[in-house]
Amino acid sequence: MSFWPFGQNLNHSNINKILDEYFHVLHELERINPSVGKAIPAIFNNVQERGTSDSLDSIPEEYSHGDEVKTARGDQKSRFEKDDQQERYEKEEEERSMNSSESSTTSFSSGSTSKTDLDEEDISNATAPMMVTTKNLDNSFIERMLVETELLNELSRQNKTLLDFICFGFFFDKKTNKKVNNMEYLVDQLMECISKIKTATTVDLNNLIDYQEQQQLDDSSQEDVYVESDTEQEEEKEDDNNSNNKKRRKRGSSSFGNDDINNNDDDDDANEDDESAYLTKATIISEIFSLDIWLISESLVKNQSYLNKIWSIINQPNFNSENSPLVPIFLKINQNLLLTRQDQYLNFIRTERSFVDDMLKHVDISLLMDFFLKIISTDKIESPTGIIELVYDQNLISKCLSFLNNKESPADIQACVGDFLKALIAISANAPLDDISIGPNSLTRQLASPESIAKLVDIMINQRGAALNTTVSIVIELIRKNNSDYDQVNLLTTTIKTHPPSNRDPIYLGYLLRKFSNHLSDFFQIILDIENDANIPLHENQLHEKFKPLGFERFKVVELIAELLHCSNMGLMNSKRAERIARRRDKVRSQLSHHLQDALNDLSIEEKEQLKTKHSPTRDTDHDLKNNNGKIDNDNNDNDDESDYGDEIDESFEIPYINMKQNIKLRTDPTVGDLFKIKLYDTRIVSKIMELFLTHPWNNFWHNVIFDIIQQIFNGRMDFSYNSFLVLSLFNLKSSYQFMTDIVISDEKGTDVSRFSPVIRDPNFDFKITTDFILRGYQDSYKFYELRKMNLGYMGHIVLIAEEVVKFSKLYKVELISPDIQVILQTEEWQYYSEEVLNETRMMYSKILGGGSYIDDGNGNIIPQLPDNTTVLTPNGDASNNNEILDSDTGSSNGTSGGGQLINVESLEEQLSLSTESDLHNKLREMLINRAQEDVDNKNTENGVFILGPPEDKNSNSNINNTNHNSNNSNNNDNNDNNDNDNDNTRNYNEDADNDNDYDHE
């Protein structure tokens, strides 16, 4: 016995008494009715071998077979034995009388009641001799057990007798007199209670108090009364012997925490209370089934009918939303079975022909879709379970894509489908990151197949709207999680012999990139259509400026282009041999699946046994593999030529790299990576979106995705790739048109003209990233600052893009790439900006917030050094060098050298002041003024013009006199300072005179 005083409620728990009553009745029936004695071993002995440990993590104790049933309670050796039935009966009667004196509860067919609730009739009925029949062994025992507050706690404590009662106990139906197992009864009661819950919204789950907590708090309601099932109510109407039990049930309070339902209450209130009671009863049963106890879960999974009934909860009408009370009931049971009895539960799942349909029918319930992903994630490479093949055969991917239809599915449903597919792609990444990862599989392979990609492209172009947004997110996730640069097996170094093709191979994205490249002009048209749509209403921002909203469609299209550009820079996308190997492996993989299907068909036909031995599909497959091995080995090792796919790229080039010969060579049978860059070059998308960059100065997401595109172009390969031509189009769009061979520049008849305007009419004809983007952005932001005292929102990304241009010009010899690029970078405007304006901006952005500078700590680390406003004096009276105030810009010392002099407070305040945008703006303004003045002076000097100055203005002279008159007082107050200044001026004058004399002397 435990001496722990808390967490126990032995006075109000009647579990042991109910068990004693049940086994007493069972013992009497066994003694009287031989048929019952035959049924007992069948129920209690047909179990798997049980271990001797009390923990149910191991197999429970073994029950003996034959004529005796061993007990698992305490130190008892047997629950009942046929050899000493009478002795056991007397012992049980003695224990029963002791329990009756302590708790004053002895009824065999109802729960315990308090001493004050019993009347003389109850006591006489309880103590009178009982004629035991099969009707006494009814469902009242299991019903009384369900209302016990300590039921779940006792099960969690692994009360073996209680577990045996739940899992192996039975009773006799009063109508049919047939035996009903307690587990079967609980499952049926669960389904009955669920069917009585008419609406999912009538019960607020957030306000539903836990059953155990409510029973412990409700001290006034301790009587064991339960919600009767319809079957039990009909049985009690027919059975007069149980009238006392029925009387006590009517007298008690609600068994599941409901208030007393008076006969005078309205029908609506009664229905609501009944519905809440049904829900609570279903919750209790689901809690029993979801306990992590081997015996309970084993009893469920070994019976197919139990699992079918539990699974049918998903098809209930009220299982229709995230807030439905049936969702947690269904998930608690099934998740526990998946966790504790995975093999048996997955065997059941594989028998469900409508598994995918059942799940997708509730795709808007995120908890259920998470459970769906958990089931799929059990099929790993090292331990396959066949679930992926199951959902693949049930067309999971194609059914998910069918939801991406604006006419048939609302936006929220499409978003849920997109989230599910993105989660599926995440756990199927080619580089596993956690335990839930399952690696590439047939599902993601189907999603990246040419058929699925064609459907996705069609959805984006024709559906647009919510379907476009969701589909773009799916494609972006597919590219990010299947980057071939992180493949665990390099496709270029594999052969069919060393790495036979399988559905677990890395996903090849070449088909995806080629399809999107061919439709890139259609995606650009989406941007143009929205730009030219006059029906889009204008919005007004906080600055009262009218603007056309960017919209999600344009943003998602450009985000897709940025991700496709990432994809085009992958290693496999720039190899012709990789595409050739991928196609060959796909062909062999499809042949293997056909051979496997043929083998399965042959095994099902007994008449073809001899034919199978002579022409074994396995041998045919091996023969094909041998032939294919030879071909693939040649592809991988000898690099043999195939006209269907072309040779590997020619890495020879001339100087400068950008020329017509190189352009024609790259455009002739390009790699899939270069194909995308060529289409991006010909459609002139980059210059258009950079124009939209400036017209939407406050959309930071838009700026970020465009900066990503520009950064990729400048950091891409400049040799053996079409990326260098993209760089040329950024610096000089006009010069780049000579290499756009796919665009007809002039055609009088108008035939063969592309959907885009000819070059002469193109508004971006003279686009240059230096003048038309960076410098223009600076100028617009400068004007805006003069008006609003704040910069435009894109200035941060403008500076980053300018830094990329400067880095590119220093990293490469641009004259070897294209002389046109060098000419642009050598212009006077750009040189002044990059050396002066950008340098000042860089210095301002690198300053520490709060002032200070960076110093070297002596170990090669650059750390911040804040200015110190104190001066530490050395013993000789001099100020320490460590506390001198240094001007971070000039490097000169503004501190004092002697202890008797004052600190320059103005210099100190300048150091302590924050570096703000205002400081930078003022510096830039001074620089621009000086720059403009220098330009004017230089031109005047060249033209021989001398500026003598404007004539004197009387008004200005009077203003100057007034100003001088007003400042007399302050000048008189500062005589000492003026004298000091005069002395300094005199000293300087004398020094200058000495210098002049020295010069004259020389």
Curated annotation (Swiss-Prot):
Record has Phosphoprotein as a keyword: yes
Intracellular or extracellular location(s): Cytoplasm
Record-given protein name: SIT4-associating protein SAP155
GO cellular component annotations of the record: cytosol; nucleus; protein serine/threonine phosphatase complex; U2-type spliceosomal complex
Function: Positive regulator of protein phosphatase SIT4. Involved in directing expression of TOR-repressed genes and in dephosphorylation of NPR1 in response to nutrient starvation. Negatively modulates K(+) efflux of the cell by the Na(+)-K(+)/H(+) antiporter NHA1.
Low complexity bias (residue ranges): 98-114, 956-976
Protein family (similarity comment): Belongs to the SAPS family.
Residue positions, PTM Phosphoserine: S58, S255
Region called Disordered, residue ranges: 51-131, 214-273, 609-645, 868-901, 940-1002
Anything else known: Present with 5960 molecules/cell in log phase SD medium.
Bias-annotated ranges (Acidic residues): 220-241, 262-273, 635-645, 991-1002
Taxonomy of the source species: Eukaryota, Fungi, Dikarya, Ascomycota, Saccharomycotina
Post-translational modification, as annotated: Hyperphosphorylated in the absence of SIT4.
GO biological process: G1/S transition of mitotic cell cycle; negative regulation of potassium ion export across plasma membrane; regulation of signal transduction
Domain of life, per lineage: Eukaryota
